Amino acid sequence: FRLLPDEYHYILTEDFVLHALQNNRSYVGYCHLLEVIPDQLKTWKVCLIACIMHFAAVKYLPKRFQNDTFYEELIEHRQYDFISYIKLDTISAPVFEKALSKIDVKSSILFHDIKKLPKHLLTEGVIYEMARHGEMNLIPTVYKDRNFYLTAVRYQGSDLDKVPEKYMDTEMCLAALESNAYAAQKYIPDRIKTSNFWKKVVEKRLFSS
């Protein structure tokens, strides 16, 4: 499309673009295509196919499709990673939470150029999901209570080192060990390592070689 001379742009129709999408053999090709085609060819169907096939294609969505309706359609097609590339002010908290909840906690979520979540996304459900995924840095400190950290270590045991001293207790450490004993064990404070603590470790079989 980049190489097509202007005098041949008349051949560019939705059907032509859809044919190109359906016959594309390059994973990144879906993203590149949406980047270069004229805005008038970025129809709902074209954009939907491109974004389903490559989550980063949402960077090139026209404004008319940067909304919950389009994002929910992506979720229905099991494309959840798009949230890494959208403008976060274009999505509501319920839809954002819905996408987050579908992503495997073992998968990393890369929020590009985002230092903190916008205020409208800081709902109880979103904060829980961010903790579950270990995305602590994007949540303001005021929202990080004991339950936030407990949720985080239950899914990401390696995050035990990020738990403030005031929240560090037996329950917190055991939860981290259950999630990832190998990573969590080195962050357990000496004051927690009592005979009663080790008894619980043995009972729960929370060992790591």
Model regions and ranges:
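Ankyrin repeat (ANK) tandem alpha-helical domains that serve as protein-protein interaction scaffolds
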Residues: 1-209
